[in-house]
Design a protein with these regions (language model features):
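Condensing-enzyme catalytic core mediating Claisen C-C bond formation in acyl metabolism
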Residues: 52-117, 121-124, 155-166, 198-206, ...
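Claisen-condensing/thiolase-fold acyl-transfer catalytic domains that form or cleave C-C bonds
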Residues: 1-31, 40, 45-47, 78, ...
Length: 233
């Protein structure tokens, strides 16, 4: 295809990174529109970052199950009912977690850090939004996200959903929930944006910046989270 291509990788925050790049390129009049894609596959992720499924390694209850799927969207200068209003690129945060199965604990601190920075930059409060949506913290990571907000910043968040926590139903028994770059956009486009209750939405992509070498060396796992603010007509 004779179309400009840019490969983006921010772990499970990659899709939000793509949206930020496209939206800012359009705002700067560099392009008129662009396509953002992301995908993930359970077996590939397990083999690359943890253990092959055939190995039969046991997983702790706080681990997550990588989603298999693919999502694409068009970001354009032309008007539509969904608008990207603002964005915040997150910093790298490291809380010293070394367990590659405990991605929720790895990513929750960076999600909080990015959210707080965005609220400060935009002079807004959590209650100014209808929903705060995170990517793939899972059940335990989502609880940690809320706990840090309350303990460190005095914010008792109620308008909050984690994509990984709701993408699977209880009968599927997928540990702490879903994960992977595609987890957030699957929930965002198939569920959240079709719900007319949500007009102003903060979407936080959460990414764990680890690799097998880092884990095998018993190094701590850093993370980063990127954020976009959407308005839906």
């Amino acid at each position: 295809l004779n179309v400009s291509f840019l490969g983006v990788y921010s772990a499970c925050a990659s899709f939000i990174s793509s949206i930020i790049i496209l939206a800012n390129s359009i705002s700067g009049k560099l392009i008129k529109e662009g396509l953002a894609f992301t995908s993930s596959h359970n077996l590939c992720s397990e083999k690359q970052f943890r253990f092959p499924v055939e190995y039969g390694a046991l997983k702790p209850i706080y681990s997550t199950f990588t989603c298999t799927g693919s999502v694409g969207c068009n970001v354009s200068k032309y008007p539509s009912r969904i608008k990207v209003i603002s964005s915040t690129i997150g910093s790298v945060v490291d809380y010293g977690i070394k367990d590659a199965n405990n991605m929720g604990a790895v990513m929750a601190p960076s999600a909080v850090d990015t959210l707080i920075k965005h609220l400060e930059y935009t002079n807004t409060k959590v209650n100014d939004y209808d929903l705060i949506l995170t990517g793939d913290l899972g059940l335990y990571g989502a609880d940690l996200f809320k706990m840090i907000l309350k303990k460190d910043y005095g914010i008792n968040i109620r308008n909050y959903i984690d994509s990984g926590s709701i993408i699977y139903n209880k009968e599927q028994e997928k540990y702490s929930g879903g994960s992977g770059p595609v987890c957030l956009p699957l929930v965002l486009f198939n569920n959240i944006l079709n719900n007319k209750r949500y007009k102003k939405i903060i979407v936080i992509g959460t990414g764990s910046l680890h690799c097998p070498t880092l884990v095998n060396q018993k190094k701590s796992i850093p993370s980063t989270s990127h954020l976009i603010s959407l308005e839906v007509e």
